[in-house]
């Protein structure tokens, strides 16, 4: 998918990018490739692949009408090089984006990236989701939490749902069907008062299958969740 293919496909979906937005995606690509020589951000560095498998894939929830261009508070867990939240932010500038990442070098990259792209209302924090999930400044504060290929739903639910307001939604982007994952996550979702409201499949323009699972938070998360850093992965609920 060349940049021109990317713009054209978005236009067909009703999103006509401004010259500023096109510049932002171009700068994003160039900085990603440049910084990838210093720290491991991605195995995908060829331009056409980045536009398809990072940029297009990241904005899929917008293209599938699961997000609106409103000043909602969005948290991205394990965003790595900023996916999916920063491509979303370029397309929908009204989003207020927060990223938590456990590697300080990635936070340095994201901070510089946001400055170079001229993004406002973006916030970056270094640390573990389990720790921030017990911090009152973050717990129960977000309308949406996104996670792209971070962990199995059984683990992911404990890392994300505590951050949501009641009625808030987890948007999990997956490369494989989540049916088996959701079966395994039934107990975790029950304990965390999360309910699966959508399990959506679609295809990238090259035909690759992708999946989006949306979980709504129904009640306050019990205080003991998330557990200490590392436990959700070692001993899933």
UniProtKB/Swiss-Prot annotation:
Q: Which domain of life is it from?
A: Bacteria
What keywords would UniProt list here?
Answer: Cytoplasm, Methyltransferase, rRNA processing, S-adenosyl-L-methionine, Transferase
User: In the Enzyme Commission scheme, what number(s) does this protein have?
Assistant: 2.1.1.-
Q: Which Pfam families match?
A: GidB
Q: Name any one GO molecular function.
A: rRNA (guanine-N7-)-methyltransferase activity
In UniProt terms, what function does this protein have?
A: Specifically methylates the N7 position of a guanine in 16S rRNA.
For this entry, the protein name equals Ribosomal RNA small subunit methyltransferase G
- The encoding gene is rsmG
